Amino acid sequence: DVYKRQFLFRLNMTGLTQPLVDLLENPAVIKVGLSLKDDFMMLHKRAPFEQHSCIELQEYVRMFGIQDKSLQKIYGILFGEKISKSQRLSNWEAEHLTEPQKQYAATDAWACLNIYNRLQELKVTGDYELEPDEPLTNQESLITNP
């Protein structure tokens, strides 16, 4: 089950291996994330590859009237819950990551996947309304139908 298993790749230690390049280039595997442009810019410095089937959530959420670009805010709008980002600025180059760092990395990936899946559900059900005449704010960006 994709929700129960996450993998943390320490690219600073392993480099960008061929199996990871194959995954990034595989059009059958959807890659979902936030600020992917920055991630791919860093990955391209490690090895040449052509990524396929990537969903940039900062752009994708706009189709649903969400203007916010932070993972915390997007997650809060869709699920009414808060996720912790306290480990974001910690030392990711350390030889050993702390448990909170590992939890942060897993939560970050899990939240992106949940956001994407929720938006896919809304796309299918049409259970949202856009109000283009009014400026969109954090909690008003996505209004679900009763």
Locations of regions flagged by a protein language model:
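Short, basic/hydrophobic alpha-helical segments
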Residues: 14-28
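Acidic beta-strand-to-loop metal/phosphate-binding motif
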Residues: 29-36
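Short active-site loop/helix that positions an aromatic residue
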Residues: 39-46
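A short alpha->loop->secondary-structure connector
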Residues: 47-55
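Short alpha-helix plus adjacent loop in nuclease-associated cores
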Residues: 55-77, 101
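Short, small-residue-biased leader/transition segments that mark boundaries at the very start
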Residues: 2-3
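Intrinsic disorder
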Residues: 140-141
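Acidic, Mg2+-coordinating catalytic module of metal-dependent nucleases/exonucleases
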Residues: 76-136
